[in-house]
Protein backbone atom coordinates (compact mmCIF):
# COMPACT_ATOMS: atom_id res chain seq x y z
CA UNK A 1 0.00 0.00 0.00
CA UNK A 2 1.39 3.44 -0.90
CA UNK A 3 0.14 6.82 0.23
CA UNK A 4 1.72 8.38 -2.83
CA UNK A 5 4.07 7.32 -5.59
CA UNK A 6 7.84 7.47 -5.42
CA UNK A 7 10.96 5.47 -6.12
CA UNK A 8 12.65 3.58 -3.33
CA UNK A 9 15.60 5.31 -1.71
CA UNK A 10 18.83 3.59 -0.64
CA UNK A 11 17.94 4.01 3.02
CA UNK A 12 14.50 2.45 2.67
CA UNK A 13 15.46 -0.93 4.10
CA UNK A 14 17.08 0.64 7.14
CA UNK A 15 14.21 3.01 7.83
CA UNK A 16 11.63 0.24 7.60
CA UNK A 17 13.30 -1.89 10.27
CA UNK A 18 10.93 -3.07 12.97
CA UNK A 19 13.10 -1.53 15.68
CA UNK A 20 12.91 1.93 14.12
CA UNK A 21 9.22 1.63 13.28
CA UNK A 22 8.34 0.65 16.85
CA UNK A 23 11.01 2.80 18.47
CA UNK A 24 11.03 5.94 20.57
CA UNK A 25 11.57 8.34 17.63
CA UNK A 26 8.40 7.24 15.84
CA UNK A 27 6.38 7.11 19.06
CA UNK A 28 7.39 10.68 19.95
CA UNK A 29 6.62 11.86 16.40
CA UNK A 30 3.14 10.31 16.58
CA UNK A 31 2.43 12.06 19.87
CA UNK A 32 3.85 15.33 18.55
CA UNK A 33 1.63 15.38 15.44
CA UNK A 34 -1.44 14.63 17.56
CA UNK A 35 -0.51 17.44 19.96
CA UNK A 36 0.08 19.91 17.11
CA UNK A 37 -3.25 18.99 15.52
CA UNK A 38 -5.05 19.73 18.77
CA UNK A 39 -3.11 22.98 19.19
CA UNK A 40 -3.73 24.21 15.64
CA UNK A 41 -7.41 23.33 15.95
CA UNK A 42 -7.58 25.94 18.71
CA UNK A 43 -5.89 28.41 16.35
CA UNK A 44 -8.56 27.84 13.71
CA UNK A 45 -6.08 26.39 11.23
CA UNK A 46 -7.40 22.83 11.00
CA UNK A 47 -11.12 23.02 11.75
CA UNK A 48 -13.76 20.88 10.08
CA UNK A 49 -11.19 18.10 9.55
CA UNK A 50 -9.39 20.45 7.11
CA UNK A 51 -5.63 20.93 7.16
CA UNK A 52 -2.94 18.44 8.06
CA UNK A 53 0.51 18.04 9.64
CA UNK A 54 3.48 15.77 9.00
CA UNK A 55 6.92 15.43 10.62
CA UNK A 56 10.01 13.29 10.20
CA UNK A 57 10.67 10.80 13.02
CA UNK A 58 13.99 12.18 14.19
CA UNK A 59 16.68 9.51 14.44
CA UNK A 60 20.18 11.06 14.67
CA UNK A 61 21.66 7.83 13.30
CA UNK A 62 19.94 8.38 9.94
CA UNK A 63 20.18 11.21 7.39
CA UNK A 64 17.07 13.40 7.35
CA UNK A 65 16.24 12.18 3.83
CA UNK A 66 16.04 8.56 5.05
CA UNK A 67 13.99 9.12 8.21
CA UNK A 68 10.46 7.78 8.56
CA UNK A 69 7.52 10.13 8.10
CA UNK A 70 4.51 10.50 10.40
CA UNK A 71 1.33 12.00 8.89
CA UNK A 72 -2.03 12.90 10.35
CA UNK A 73 -5.05 11.07 8.89
CA UNK A 74 -7.97 12.41 6.90
CA UNK A 75 -11.48 12.58 8.31
CA UNK A 76 -10.55 12.55 11.99
CA UNK A 77 -11.56 15.41 14.28
CA UNK A 78 -8.33 17.30 14.89
CA UNK A 79 -9.19 18.29 18.47
CA UNK A 80 -9.54 14.59 19.33
CA UNK A 81 -6.39 13.35 17.61
CA UNK A 82 -4.25 10.81 19.46
CA UNK A 83 -0.94 9.16 18.60
CA UNK A 84 -2.66 5.95 17.51
CA UNK A 85 -4.49 7.82 14.72
CA UNK A 86 -1.26 8.51 12.82
CA UNK A 87 0.13 6.97 9.66
CA UNK A 88 3.82 6.10 9.37
CA UNK A 89 5.43 6.22 5.92
CA UNK A 90 8.83 5.34 4.53
CA UNK A 91 11.03 8.13 3.21
CA UNK A 92 9.65 7.55 -0.30
CA UNK A 93 5.96 7.59 0.70
CA UNK A 94 5.14 3.92 1.28
CA UNK A 95 2.69 3.36 4.15
CA UNK A 96 4.33 1.19 6.80
CA UNK A 97 1.80 1.54 9.61
CA UNK A 98 -1.91 2.41 9.52
CA UNK A 99 -4.33 3.14 12.38
CA UNK A 100 -6.98 0.59 13.29
CA UNK A 101 -10.61 1.26 12.43
CA UNK A 102 -12.83 2.82 15.08
CA UNK A 103 -16.54 2.07 15.59
CA UNK A 104 -19.32 4.16 14.06
CA UNK A 105 -19.71 7.13 13.59
CA UNK A 106 -15.98 7.28 12.87
CA UNK A 107 -14.96 6.89 9.23
CA UNK A 108 -12.57 4.15 8.10
CA UNK A 109 -8.93 5.28 8.44
CA UNK A 110 -7.45 7.13 5.49
CA UNK A 111 -4.09 8.83 4.99
CA UNK A 112 -4.32 12.58 4.48
CA UNK A 113 -5.13 13.80 0.98
CA UNK A 114 -2.17 16.17 1.40
CA UNK A 115 0.31 13.27 1.30
CA UNK A 116 1.57 13.74 -2.29
CA UNK A 117 2.03 17.47 -1.67
CA UNK A 118 3.83 16.83 1.61
CA UNK A 119 6.18 14.46 -0.22
CA UNK A 120 7.09 17.20 -2.70
CA UNK A 121 8.25 19.41 0.17
CA UNK A 122 10.20 16.53 1.69
CA UNK A 123 11.88 15.53 -1.57
CA UNK A 124 12.42 18.96 -3.15
CA UNK A 125 13.24 20.98 -0.04
CA UNK A 126 14.66 18.41 2.36
CA UNK A 127 11.99 19.38 4.88
CA UNK A 128 11.79 17.99 8.38
CA UNK A 129 8.12 18.94 8.83
CA UNK A 130 5.25 20.36 6.76
CA UNK A 131 2.08 22.10 7.93
CA UNK A 132 -1.05 22.60 5.83
CA UNK A 133 -3.36 25.24 7.31
CA UNK A 134 -6.85 26.34 6.32
CA UNK A 135 -6.61 29.46 8.49
CA UNK A 136 -9.06 32.12 7.30
CA UNK A 137 -6.29 34.71 6.92
CA UNK A 138 -4.45 32.43 4.47
CA UNK A 139 -7.54 32.36 2.24
CA UNK A 140 -8.34 36.07 2.40
CA UNK A 141 -4.70 37.03 1.75
CA UNK A 142 -5.02 35.46 -1.71
CA UNK A 143 -8.22 37.43 -2.41
CA UNK A 144 -6.80 40.91 -1.80
CA UNK A 145 -5.62 40.89 -5.41
CA UNK A 146 -7.44 38.10 -7.28
CA UNK A 147 -5.03 38.28 -10.23
CA UNK A 148 -1.79 38.20 -8.26
CA UNK A 149 0.49 35.19 -8.54
CA UNK A 150 2.42 36.20 -5.41
CA UNK A 151 1.77 37.63 -1.97
CA UNK A 152 4.30 40.38 -1.23
CA UNK A 153 5.08 42.26 1.98
CA UNK A 154 7.99 44.23 3.39
CA UNK A 155 9.05 46.18 6.48
CA UNK A 156 6.97 44.20 8.96
CA UNK A 157 8.47 42.82 12.16
CA UNK A 158 7.47 39.16 11.84
CA UNK A 159 9.08 38.83 8.39
CA UNK A 160 12.35 38.07 10.17
CA UNK A 161 10.74 34.90 11.51
CA UNK A 162 10.74 33.51 7.96
CA UNK A 163 13.92 31.65 7.02
CA UNK A 164 16.34 33.78 5.02
CA UNK A 165 14.48 37.06 5.62
CA UNK A 166 14.95 40.19 7.69
CA UNK A 167 12.76 43.16 8.57
CA UNK A 168 13.74 45.16 5.47
CA UNK A 169 13.49 42.23 3.07
CA UNK A 170 10.58 41.67 0.74
CA UNK A 171 8.66 38.51 1.56
CA UNK A 172 7.37 36.79 -1.58
CA UNK A 173 5.00 33.83 -1.28
CA UNK A 174 3.86 32.17 -4.53
CA UNK A 175 0.12 31.66 -5.04
CA UNK A 176 -1.24 28.68 -6.96
CA UNK A 177 -4.83 28.19 -8.06
CA UNK A 178 -7.14 25.89 -6.12
CA UNK A 179 -8.59 22.66 -7.53
CA UNK A 180 -11.58 20.50 -6.52
CA UNK A 181 -9.33 17.77 -5.14
CA UNK A 182 -6.19 18.19 -3.03
CA UNK A 183 -4.04 15.76 -5.02
CA UNK A 184 -4.65 17.82 -8.18
CA UNK A 185 -2.51 20.57 -6.62
CA UNK A 186 0.62 18.39 -6.61
CA UNK A 187 2.14 19.50 -9.93
CA UNK A 188 1.46 23.21 -9.44
CA UNK A 189 2.88 23.06 -5.92
CA UNK A 190 6.02 21.39 -7.25
CA UNK A 191 6.35 24.04 -9.96
CA UNK A 192 6.05 26.81 -7.37
CA UNK A 193 8.65 25.16 -5.12
CA UNK A 194 11.05 24.92 -8.06
CA UNK A 195 10.40 28.47 -9.26
CA UNK A 196 10.86 30.06 -5.82
CA UNK A 197 13.98 28.48 -4.28
CA UNK A 198 13.95 30.84 -1.28
CA UNK A 199 10.29 30.28 -0.44
CA UNK A 200 9.29 28.20 2.58
CA UNK A 201 5.57 28.31 1.83
CA UNK A 202 3.05 28.19 -1.01
CA UNK A 203 -0.41 29.75 -0.81
CA UNK A 204 -3.39 28.07 -2.47
CA UNK A 205 -5.97 30.62 -3.56
CA UNK A 206 -9.21 30.55 -1.55
CA UNK A 207 -7.91 27.45 0.23
CA UNK A 208 -4.93 27.71 2.58
CA UNK A 209 -1.16 27.40 2.82
CA UNK A 210 1.61 24.80 2.86
CA UNK A 211 4.56 25.70 5.11
CA UNK A 212 7.72 23.64 5.60
CA UNK A 213 10.83 23.82 7.73
CA UNK A 214 13.89 21.77 8.58
CA UNK A 215 12.27 20.78 11.89
CA UNK A 216 8.80 20.85 13.41
CA UNK A 217 9.79 23.86 15.51
CA UNK A 218 10.98 25.76 12.45
CA UNK A 219 7.85 24.87 10.47
CA UNK A 220 5.56 25.84 13.37
CA UNK A 221 7.38 29.13 13.99
CA UNK A 222 7.22 30.10 10.33
CA UNK A 223 3.55 29.10 10.08
CA UNK A 224 2.75 31.38 13.02
CA UNK A 225 4.67 34.23 11.39
CA UNK A 226 2.93 33.73 8.04
CA UNK A 227 -0.51 33.79 9.67
CA UNK A 228 0.43 36.95 11.58
CA UNK A 229 1.63 38.66 8.40
CA UNK A 230 -1.44 37.67 6.38
CA UNK A 231 -3.69 38.96 9.17
CA UNK A 232 -1.69 42.21 9.24
CA UNK A 233 -2.05 42.62 5.46
CA UNK A 234 -5.82 42.14 5.69
CA UNK A 235 -6.12 44.74 8.45
CA UNK A 236 -3.87 47.19 6.60
CA UNK A 237 -6.01 46.70 3.50
CA UNK A 238 -9.11 47.55 5.54
CA UNK A 239 -7.38 50.76 6.66
CA UNK A 240 -6.36 51.63 3.10
CA UNK A 241 -2.67 51.15 3.93
CA UNK A 242 -0.25 49.57 1.45
CA UNK A 243 1.56 46.61 3.06
CA UNK A 244 3.77 46.01 -0.01
CA UNK A 245 5.89 49.17 0.26
CA UNK A 246 8.54 50.12 2.84
CA UNK A 247 6.76 53.29 3.98
CA UNK A 248 3.29 51.64 4.17
CA UNK A 249 1.59 54.70 2.72
CA UNK A 250 -1.99 54.96 1.49
CA UNK A 251 -3.03 52.42 -1.13
CA UNK A 252 -3.11 53.83 -4.66
CA UNK A 253 -1.43 57.14 -3.81
CA UNK A 254 -4.01 58.31 -1.29
CA UNK A 255 -6.70 58.21 -3.98
CA UNK A 256 -8.51 55.42 -2.20
CA UNK A 257 -11.13 56.50 0.36
CA UNK A 258 -10.22 55.91 4.00
CA UNK A 259 -13.02 53.43 4.52
CA UNK A 260 -12.96 50.35 2.35
CA UNK A 261 -16.73 50.24 2.74
CA UNK A 262 -17.15 53.71 1.26
CA UNK A 263 -20.05 54.12 -1.13
CA UNK A 264 -17.53 54.78 -3.90
CA UNK A 265 -16.10 51.31 -3.37
CA UNK A 266 -18.97 48.83 -3.66
CA UNK A 267 -18.67 45.86 -1.31
CA UNK A 268 -15.34 47.16 -0.08
CA UNK A 269 -13.59 46.52 -3.41
CA UNK A 270 -11.38 49.15 -5.09
CA UNK A 271 -12.99 51.06 -7.94
CA UNK A 272 -12.25 49.08 -11.09
CA UNK A 273 -11.90 52.35 -13.00
CA UNK A 274 -9.14 53.67 -10.75
CA UNK A 275 -5.83 54.04 -12.58
CA UNK A 276 -2.70 52.40 -11.27
CA UNK A 277 0.66 53.19 -12.84
CA UNK A 278 3.94 51.41 -12.27
CA UNK A 279 7.49 51.72 -13.54
CA UNK A 280 9.61 48.60 -14.00
CA UNK A 281 13.34 49.20 -14.41
CA UNK A 282 16.14 47.08 -15.79
CA UNK A 283 19.52 47.54 -14.06
CA UNK A 284 22.47 46.98 -16.44
CA UNK A 285 22.61 49.83 -18.94
CA UNK A 286 19.48 51.44 -17.48
CA UNK A 287 20.00 52.44 -13.85
CA UNK A 288 23.60 51.29 -13.66
CA UNK A 289 26.57 51.38 -16.07
CA UNK A 290 27.19 48.04 -17.76
CA UNK A 291 30.85 48.53 -16.92
CA UNK A 292 30.08 48.36 -13.19
CA UNK A 293 28.52 44.94 -13.62
CA UNK A 294 31.07 43.55 -16.07
CA UNK A 295 34.21 45.16 -14.62
CA UNK A 296 33.40 45.15 -10.89
CA UNK A 297 30.54 42.84 -9.88
CA UNK A 298 31.28 39.84 -12.11
CA UNK A 299 35.04 39.82 -11.42
CA UNK A 300 34.40 40.09 -7.68
CA UNK A 301 32.11 37.05 -7.78
CA UNK A 302 34.55 35.12 -9.98
CA UNK A 303 37.58 35.95 -7.83
CA UNK A 304 35.81 35.11 -4.56
CA UNK A 305 33.75 32.05 -5.48
CA UNK A 306 36.32 29.57 -4.12
CA UNK A 307 36.80 31.54 -0.90
CA UNK A 308 33.04 31.83 -0.41
CA UNK A 309 32.32 28.15 -1.03
CA UNK A 310 35.18 27.04 1.22
CA UNK A 311 34.19 29.25 4.16
CA UNK A 312 30.44 28.55 3.94
CA UNK A 313 30.45 24.98 2.60
CA UNK A 314 28.50 23.49 5.51
CA UNK A 315 25.89 26.26 5.76
CA UNK A 316 22.28 25.58 4.74
CA UNK A 317 22.38 28.51 2.33
CA UNK A 318 25.43 27.23 0.47
CA UNK A 319 24.07 23.69 0.45
CA UNK A 320 21.01 25.06 -1.33
CA UNK A 321 23.26 26.97 -3.77
CA UNK A 322 25.21 23.80 -4.53
CA UNK A 323 21.98 21.85 -5.00
CA UNK A 324 20.76 24.34 -7.62
CA UNK A 325 24.15 24.32 -9.36
CA UNK A 326 24.11 20.51 -9.51
CA UNK A 327 20.71 20.54 -11.20
CA UNK A 328 21.86 23.17 -13.71
CA UNK A 329 25.16 21.42 -14.48
CA UNK A 330 23.43 18.07 -15.01
CA UNK A 331 21.18 19.76 -17.55
CA UNK A 332 24.15 21.53 -19.15
CA UNK A 333 26.05 18.25 -19.51
CA UNK A 334 23.05 16.64 -21.20
CA UNK A 335 22.84 19.61 -23.59
CA UNK A 336 26.57 19.65 -24.30
CA UNK A 337 27.16 23.15 -22.90
CA UNK A 338 30.83 24.05 -23.34
CA UNK A 339 32.71 24.47 -20.04
CA UNK A 340 30.42 22.20 -18.02
CA UNK A 341 32.18 19.60 -15.87
CA UNK A 342 30.60 16.92 -13.65
CA UNK A 343 30.26 17.75 -9.96
CA UNK A 344 31.28 14.92 -7.59
CA UNK A 345 28.61 13.66 -5.15
CA UNK A 346 28.13 15.28 -1.73
CA UNK A 347 30.08 12.56 0.04
CA UNK A 348 33.16 13.15 -2.15
CA UNK A 349 36.17 15.11 -0.96
CA UNK A 350 35.23 18.73 -0.23
CA UNK A 351 38.05 20.14 -2.37
CA UNK A 352 37.04 18.00 -5.35
CA UNK A 353 33.47 19.27 -5.12
CA UNK A 354 34.60 22.89 -4.77
CA UNK A 355 37.05 22.59 -7.70
CA UNK A 356 34.24 21.36 -9.95
CA UNK A 357 31.85 24.04 -8.72
CA UNK A 358 34.42 26.79 -9.32
CA UNK A 359 35.11 25.53 -12.84
CA UNK A 360 31.41 25.55 -13.71
CA UNK A 361 30.74 28.94 -12.12
CA UNK A 362 33.70 30.56 -13.87
CA UNK A 363 32.46 29.17 -17.19
CA UNK A 364 28.94 30.44 -16.52
CA UNK A 365 30.22 33.92 -15.62
CA UNK A 366 32.43 34.04 -18.72
CA UNK A 367 29.42 33.18 -20.89
CA UNK A 368 27.29 35.78 -19.02
CA UNK A 369 24.56 33.21 -18.50
CA UNK A 370 21.27 34.44 -17.03
CA UNK A 371 20.44 31.40 -14.92
CA UNK A 372 18.98 31.29 -11.42
CA UNK A 373 21.59 28.98 -9.88
CA UNK A 374 24.45 31.30 -10.87
CA UNK A 375 22.64 34.50 -9.96
CA UNK A 376 21.68 33.20 -6.52
CA UNK A 377 25.28 32.23 -5.70
CA UNK A 378 26.60 35.53 -7.05
CA UNK A 379 24.15 37.38 -4.83
CA UNK A 380 25.46 35.60 -1.75
CA UNK A 381 29.07 36.38 -2.71
CA UNK A 382 28.23 40.03 -3.38
CA UNK A 383 26.48 40.26 -0.02
CA UNK A 384 29.82 39.61 1.65
CA UNK A 385 31.42 42.29 -0.52
CA UNK A 386 28.80 44.90 0.34
CA UNK A 387 28.88 44.04 4.04
CA UNK A 388 32.67 44.42 4.09
CA UNK A 389 32.43 47.69 2.10
CA UNK A 390 34.58 46.18 -0.66
CA UNK A 391 31.66 46.86 -2.99
CA UNK A 392 29.42 49.91 -3.36
CA UNK A 393 26.42 50.09 -5.65
CA UNK A 394 26.71 52.44 -8.64
CA UNK A 395 23.79 54.18 -10.35
CA UNK A 396 23.67 56.96 -12.92
CA UNK A 397 23.41 60.46 -11.41
CA UNK A 398 19.87 61.01 -12.72
CA UNK A 399 18.49 57.83 -11.14
CA UNK A 400 18.12 58.90 -7.46
CA UNK A 401 16.21 62.08 -8.34
CA UNK A 402 13.89 60.19 -10.67
CA UNK A 403 13.18 57.56 -8.01
CA UNK A 404 12.43 60.26 -5.45
CA UNK A 405 10.13 62.07 -7.89
CA UNK A 406 8.20 58.94 -8.84
CA UNK A 407 7.91 57.95 -5.19
CA UNK A 408 6.60 61.38 -4.17
CA UNK A 409 4.02 61.33 -6.96
CA UNK A 410 2.70 57.94 -5.84
CA UNK A 411 4.20 55.98 -8.71
CA UNK A 412 5.26 52.47 -7.72
CA UNK A 413 8.69 51.49 -8.98
CA UNK A 414 9.95 47.92 -9.37
CA UNK A 415 13.17 46.31 -10.55
CA UNK A 416 13.37 43.43 -13.05
CA UNK A 417 16.88 42.13 -13.54
CA UNK A 418 18.65 38.90 -14.35
CA UNK A 419 20.51 39.36 -11.07
CA UNK A 420 18.93 37.74 -8.01
CA UNK A 421 16.52 39.76 -5.90
CA UNK A 422 19.07 39.73 -3.10
CA UNK A 423 21.74 41.15 -5.42
CA UNK A 424 19.33 43.87 -6.56
CA UNK A 425 18.58 44.88 -2.98
CA UNK A 426 22.28 44.95 -2.14
CA UNK A 427 23.07 47.21 -5.08
CA UNK A 428 20.33 49.75 -4.40
CA UNK A 429 20.77 49.54 -0.64
CA UNK A 430 24.46 50.49 -0.73
CA UNK A 431 24.99 53.40 -3.13
CA UNK A 432 26.88 56.67 -2.84
CA UNK A 433 23.42 58.29 -2.66
CA UNK A 434 22.45 56.18 0.34
CA UNK A 435 19.82 53.45 0.55
CA UNK A 436 17.55 53.81 -2.50
CA UNK A 437 15.37 50.83 -1.59
CA UNK A 438 13.00 53.18 0.20
CA UNK A 439 11.81 54.30 -3.24
CA UNK A 440 11.34 50.78 -4.62
CA UNK A 441 8.28 48.59 -4.10
CA UNK A 442 9.57 45.21 -5.24
CA UNK A 443 12.10 43.15 -7.13
CA UNK A 444 11.73 40.57 -9.90
CA UNK A 445 14.44 38.22 -11.15
CA UNK A 446 14.74 35.18 -13.41
CA UNK A 447 12.48 33.14 -11.13
CA UNK A 448 9.71 35.16 -12.80
CA UNK A 449 10.97 34.09 -16.22
CA UNK A 450 13.46 34.87 -18.96
CA UNK A 451 13.64 38.60 -19.65
CA UNK A 452 13.37 38.05 -23.38
CA UNK A 453 10.11 36.10 -23.15
CA UNK A 454 6.71 37.79 -23.31
CA UNK A 455 5.16 35.53 -20.69
CA UNK A 456 7.58 36.90 -18.08
CA UNK A 457 6.13 40.38 -18.48
CA UNK A 458 2.61 38.98 -18.40
CA UNK A 459 3.47 37.38 -15.04
CA UNK A 460 4.76 40.72 -13.76
CA UNK A 461 1.60 42.53 -14.84
CA UNK A 462 -0.44 39.92 -12.97
CA UNK A 463 1.68 40.39 -9.84
CA UNK A 464 1.39 44.18 -9.92
CA UNK A 465 -2.40 44.03 -10.09
CA UNK A 466 -2.86 46.73 -12.73
CA UNK A 467 -6.08 46.91 -14.72
CA UNK A 468 -4.09 46.79 -17.95
CA UNK A 469 -0.44 46.02 -18.84
CA UNK A 470 -0.44 49.38 -20.63
CA UNK A 471 -0.35 51.03 -17.20
CA UNK A 472 3.19 49.71 -16.72
CA UNK A 473 6.22 51.55 -18.10
CA UNK A 474 9.24 49.31 -18.68
CA UNK A 475 12.67 50.85 -19.24
CA UNK A 476 15.51 48.70 -20.57
CA UNK A 477 18.60 48.92 -22.74
CA UNK A 478 18.04 45.56 -24.47
CA UNK A 479 16.05 45.53 -27.71
CA UNK A 480 14.85 41.92 -27.29
CA UNK A 481 13.52 42.71 -23.81
CA UNK A 482 11.74 45.77 -25.17
CA UNK A 483 10.06 43.64 -27.84
CA UNK A 484 8.95 41.03 -25.29
CA UNK A 485 7.54 43.67 -22.92
CA UNK A 486 5.73 45.47 -25.73
CA UNK A 487 4.19 42.16 -26.84
CA UNK A 488 2.82 41.80 -23.30
CA UNK A 489 1.17 45.23 -23.60
CA UNK A 490 3.68 47.31 -21.64
CA UNK A 491 4.67 50.85 -22.53
CA UNK A 492 8.40 50.63 -23.30
CA UNK A 493 11.30 53.07 -23.40
CA UNK A 494 14.84 52.07 -24.36
CA UNK A 495 17.69 53.55 -22.34
CA UNK A 496 20.70 54.86 -24.25
CA UNK A 497 23.69 54.90 -21.91
CA UNK A 498 27.48 54.87 -22.43
CA UNK A 499 28.65 51.35 -23.21
CA UNK A 500 25.23 50.01 -24.22
CA UNK A 501 24.92 47.81 -27.30
CA UNK A 502 23.73 49.56 -30.48
CA UNK A 503 20.08 49.24 -31.44
CA UNK A 504 18.77 47.97 -34.78
CA UNK A 505 17.83 50.61 -37.31
CA UNK A 506 14.15 51.55 -37.31
CA UNK A 507 13.63 49.75 -34.00
CA UNK A 508 10.44 51.73 -33.38
CA UNK A 509 10.90 52.50 -29.67
CA UNK A 510 11.18 55.80 -27.85
CA UNK A 511 14.68 56.29 -26.43
CA UNK A 512 16.11 58.40 -23.61
CA UNK A 513 19.61 59.23 -22.39
CA UNK A 514 18.49 60.22 -18.89
CA UNK A 515 15.53 59.52 -16.62
CA UNK A 516 15.04 63.29 -16.45
CA UNK A 517 13.61 63.07 -19.98
CA UNK A 518 10.63 61.00 -18.80
From Swiss-Prot:
The keyword Lyase applies. Residues 279-518 are annotated as: Enolase-phosphatase E1. Its cofactor is Zn(2+); Mg(2+). This is Probable bifunctional methylthioribulose-1-phosphate dehydratase/enolase-phosphatase E1. It catalyses: 5-(methylsulfanyl)-D-ribulose 1-phosphate = 5-methylsulfanyl-2,3-dioxopentyl phosphate + H2O; 5-methylsulfanyl-2,3-dioxopentyl phosphate + H2O = 1,2-dihydroxy-5-(methylsulfanyl)pent-1-en-3-one + phosphate. CDD domains: HAD_EP (cd01629). Substrate 2 binds at residues 417-418, 451. The active site is at residue 157. NCBIfam families: enolase-ppase, HAD-SF-IA-v1, salvage_mtnB. Residues 1-242 are annotated as: Methylthioribulose-1-phosphate dehydratase. Zn(2+) binds at residues 132, 134, 207. It comes from the Eukaryota. Its EC number is 4.2.1.109, 3.1.3.77. Substrate 1 binds at residue 114. Disulfide bonds: none annotated. GO terms for molecular function: acireductone synthase activity; magnesium ion binding; methylthioribulose 1-phosphate dehydratase activity; zinc ion binding. In the N-terminal section; belongs to the aldolase class II family. MtnB subfamily. In the C-terminal section; belongs to the HAD-like hydrolase superfamily. MasA/MtnC family. One of its GO terms (biological process) is L-methionine salvage from methylthioadenosine. Binds 1 zinc ion per subunit. Mg(2+) binds at residues 282, 284, 477. Pathway: Amino-acid biosynthesis; L-methionine biosynthesis via salvage pathway; L-methionine from S-methyl-5-thio-alpha-D-ribose 1-phosphate: step 2/6; Amino-acid biosynthesis; L-methionine biosynthesis via salvage pathway; L-methionine from S-methyl-5-thio-alpha-D-ribose 1-phosphate: step 3/6; Amino-acid biosynthesis; L-methionine biosynthesis via salvage pathway; L-methionine from S-methyl-5-thio-alpha-D-ribose 1-phosphate: step 4/6. GO terms for cellular component: cytoplasm. Keywords: Amino-acid biosynthesis, Hydrolase, Lyase, Magnesium, Metal-binding, Methionine biosynthesis, Multifunctional enzyme, Zinc. It holds the Pfam family Hydrolase.
